[in-house]
């Protein structure tokens, strides 16, 4: 690792600790030549996870995009932000653990709806109405009936 002060190629590690929820390592280093101290971060390269949309369009998975949709569905509902963040983290982890580079958007949507139904039914119906593109009140009523059946 080159020293940012003198450009010498040698440094020694003084301290290492996990960072970014364990996804990287923070290292405190000291240059062997000028004794300048600096911090580096070591991070493994994550393979991108691609979401294949219904129309065949491919885009990189975004936990932030999923969280924004959930926040919108849970607006004015008693659902803590931390719960939604944890849900997004768990879904991403589960998708990455499948060991595939591409997933269908339908799978992601179903995973979100399964979890959201257990957290808040009103938010679930809001999310489902947008995700499944309810065309009229009858489709909405059918979804509510399915939700009631699942509870029993």
Curated annotation (Swiss-Prot):
Compositional bias segments (type: Polar residues): 1-10
Keywords for the protein's UniProt record, in alphabetical order: ATP-binding, DNA-binding, Metal-binding, Nucleotide-binding, Repressor, Transcription, Transcription regulation, Zinc, Zinc-finger
One Pfam match: Zn_ribbon_NrdR
Sequence segments annotated as region (Disordered): 1-21
Residue ranges constituting the ATP-cone domain according to the UniProt record: 49-139
UniProt cross-references to InterPro entries, sorted A to Z: ATP-cone_dom (IPR005144), NrdR-like_N (IPR055173), RNR_NrdR-like (IPR003796)
Cofactor: Zn(2+)
Top-rank lineage group of the source organism: Bacteria
PROSITE patterns from the UniProt entry: ATP_CONE
Record note on cofactor: Binds 1 zinc ion.
GO biological-process terms attached to the record: negative regulation of DNA-templated transcription
Gene Ontology MF: a single term: ATP binding
Zinc finger (unnamed): 3-34
Main function: Negatively regulates transcription of bacterial ribonucleotide reductase nrd genes and operons by binding to NrdR-boxes.
HAMAP family: NrdR (MF_00440)
Family, as annotated: Belongs to the NrdR family.
Entry protein name: Transcriptional repressor NrdR
Originating species: Bacillus velezensis (strain DSM 23117 / BGSC 10A6 / LMG 26770 / FZB42)
């Amino acid at each position: 690792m080159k020293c940012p002060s003198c450009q010498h190629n040698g440094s020694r590690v003084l301290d290492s600790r996990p960072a970014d929820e364990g996804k990287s390592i923070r290292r405190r280093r000291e240059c062997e030549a000028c004794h300048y101290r600096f911090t580096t971060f070591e991070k493994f390269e994550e393979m991108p996870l691609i979401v294949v949309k219904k129309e065949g369009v491919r885009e990189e998975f975004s936990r932030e995009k999923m969280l924004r949709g959930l926040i919108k569905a849970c607006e004015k509902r008693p659902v803590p932000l931390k719960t939604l963040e944890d849900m997004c983290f768990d879904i991403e982890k589960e998708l990455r653990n499948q060991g595939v580079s591409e997933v269908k958007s339908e799978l992601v949507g179903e995973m979100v709806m399964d979890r959201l139904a257990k957290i808040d039914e009103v938010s679930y119906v809001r999310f489902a109405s947008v995700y499944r593109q309810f065309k009229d009140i009858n489709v909405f009523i059918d979804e509510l009936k399915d939700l009631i059946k699942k509870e029993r």
